[in-house]
Amino acid sequence: MEKDERKAIMDKEIDLIQGCISRMAQNSFIIKGWAITLVAVALALLPETFDAKLLCGVSVVVTACFWYLDAFYLKMEKLYRLKYQWVIENRQKSDMYCYDLNPHNKKMWSPKIENEPCILRVMITKTLVPIYGSIIAFSLWMLFHL
């Protein structure tokens, strides 16, 4: 394969991976918005018509689910970033795994990375704990003080 042709393939592959990264980041952003909106509605508007303790309990469960989903999307974004880095470093040398968009293909990760990022570690990052931790803490506080 010629150098120009190989560069064109790499550019297209990078564009595809960047699209996946952007989609995961957008999904994470949307999840945060939905989580905050739903919990705010549940805690602010509905206690007059429903049992407040039940709503606080539901808020904790819903927030935990959104927290997990957000961590999942951030983990996937991280995996696509590993793939992006591998393509930049290796595509000029080889056609192996050309257009492979499977983020779990460990052969397309940097040799420094041995294991897939753990979703629980992603959940306790400094970007997610303040958002979801504060919502859960407030919901639990209301649950035990109402």
Please provide the spans of the model-predicted regions.
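A hydrophobic membrane-anchoring alpha-helix module
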Residues: 97-146
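Membrane-water interface of alpha-helical transmembrane segments
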Residues: 26, 49, 53-56, 122, ...
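Inner-leaflet juxtamembrane helices
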Residues: 55-108
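Cytosolic-side membrane-entry/anchor segment at the start of a transmembrane helix
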Residues: 1-45
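Hydrophobic alpha-helical transmembrane segments
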Residues: 42-61, 66, 137-146
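Hydrophobic alpha-helical transmembrane segments of multipass integral membrane proteins
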Residues: 34-37, 41, 60, 64, ...
